[in-house]
Amino acid sequence: MLTALVLFLSGCDKENKLSPTEDLGIVDMFSPDENADPRVKAMYNDYGVWVRTYFSSIDELTNSILAEDAIVAMRGAENLEEEKIPEVLNYSEALLSNVSKEYANSFFPLEFFYVKQYGALYWIYPVKALGRSRLILMWPNTTDGAIPVTDPVNHYYQDSVLTSEVWRKLGSMIVARMEEPLKEFVAGGKAYDDGEAYEKLGNEYDKDEEAWKEENPDADDEDEDEVNSRPYVIKYKNAVAELCRNGGYITGGSSRSFEGDFSEWLRLLVMESYENIKKDYLDNSKSRALKYEIITKYFKEYGWDIQAAGNKYRTEFDKYKASLPDGD
């Protein structure tokens, strides 16, 4: 009976509005109630995403559809501070406004759940995908490199580190909702090898580094420019770049799986201009140029001009960077 129920839930379309049962040990999930913030209701009605900002018990947060986080259930979490709610609504609205409603309703997680802290001590997760249905974000976010919130309305466009991490997580959650990988996209590059080629390059790098340091024992690893000029570093970077060009990947790690490959393409497309993508990724790789055409066409089938979103992001981010004092 349980196996049949799991299979049923796994195959449900997002728009079927799943309600987990007590028998599965999962807290019931509902849509926003009639007294919810109008902005929360609007995002739910338009995109099928419920922006949540409060939990009454840890199980309500750490138990999702067919997924639970036992570690944080033990370590604990803190509710979002009430005065931060407008900020997370701004962030959510900005993100969702860059996605077509059809695509979000078909593939996005059911919930964005914002908290002050998720986990404790060594088990803190600034951005956490809980299964394919709940994306948990700490706010203010402590992802390494994330910036303080100074302009809540435009923070989505200003904190590229946080936004990159969010889109990577969303990419994995989207893939989990697909019936199968995008066949044409996969065929456009080299077959995934579970990271074998990429890890081989890493192993060679370690050996080359060890040999170089034996010959240069007084080298200063704190000088970033000097480190990047070392022959073993240049060799490694060139080898990874070649792996990516030949395979149609954005990063070396993308060679592991469709999930990683799709997630990196998604993140790039929704945050970068066509001009920069063409210059940095397409002009030097036939495989990437082909995969670009296939994946952008795929998104357009759901009414999503993802490149337009990327063009906008680059424009807004550059505007923000230009406004900063020199040196920032």
Predicted regions and their residues:
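C-terminal motif of bacterial Sec signal peptides marking the signal peptidase cleavage site
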Residues: 7-11
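Acidic/polar, low-complexity intrinsically disordered N-terminal segments immediately downstream
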Residues: 12-103, 284-328
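Auxiliary, metal-adjacent structural segments of Zn-dependent hydrolase domains
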Residues: 85-136
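Lumenal/extracellular "mature" regions of secretory-pathway glycan-modifying transferases
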Residues: 124-133, 137-154
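Active-site recognition of the HExxH zinc-binding catalytic motif
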Residues: 143-190
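Metalloprotease/metallohydrolase-associated module, dominated by Zn2+-dependent proteases
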Residues: 195-328
